[in-house]
Amino acid sequence: MQAPPSFYEGDTLEVAKKLLGQKLVHIVDGIKRSGIIVEVEAYKGPGDKAAHSYGGRRTDRTEVMFGAPGHAYVYLIYGMYHCFNVITAPVGTPQGVLIRAIEPVDGIEEIKLARYNKTDITKAQYKNLTNGPGKLCRALGITLEERGVSLQSDTLHIELVPEEEHISSQYKITAGPRINIDYAEEAVHYPWRFYYEGHPFVSKK
């Protein structure tokens, strides 16, 4: 079942934790690619110096953040790596959750080809498929074309995992500082990164 619009409403930190264990799905050329979300970071808008929308900054790139929750915010870093975020909070409150890492589930062969241009890969390469925001976007075929897309769409959405299949019973959720935000002054220390401790696909222990 797709996560309904109400799933993305409410406190961004709570939405971030709720996203753990759910399945990120992207249909590419009719083939389902997906992975279980194992690591996220919350960004809380105007008061968060690490957020693109800090101080209420509103640009063509960030405009989608000011819209309705439950939409995709995709941007480029270093001019080459895409990052996928889920918009949260009410309209006009530019907050979101960065999906940092997933465990591949569906479309494994397509994911391997997207990452390594081959399907015969080593164990180390397999572990490296989707353990970072840029890696998972490349693996799932998420690009700037997906910016602003509703997560109620058939081709890009969050699929809720049934409780009996949820991996939360196997891993402890740990909170810590977000990664690569040295510019963000006191916000560097906010414990707004959430991940499954010990999960092999987490980007950084």
From Swiss-Prot:
Keyword field contains DNA damage: yes
Claim: Cytoplasm is one of the keywords in the record: no
Regions that span the bilayer: none
Gene Ontology terms describing biological process: base-excision repair
Taxonomic superkingdom: Bacteria
Enzyme Commission code(s) on record: 3.2.2.-
Region forming the signal peptide: none
Cited Gene3D superfamilies: Methylpurine-DNA glycosylase (MPG)
Keyword entries, A-Z: DNA damage, DNA repair, Hydrolase
Matching InterPro entries: Formyl_transferase-like_C_sf (IPR011034), MPG (IPR003180), MPG_sf (IPR036995)
Pfam families per the UniProt record, alphabetical: Pur_DNA_glyco
GO molecular function: alkylbase DNA N-glycosylase activity; DNA binding
Top-level EC class as recorded in UniProt: hydrolase
Entry's family note: Belongs to the DNA glycosylase MPG family.
Name recorded for this polypeptide: Putative 3-methyladenine DNA glycosylase
Organism, scientific name: Bacillus thuringiensis (strain Al Hakam)
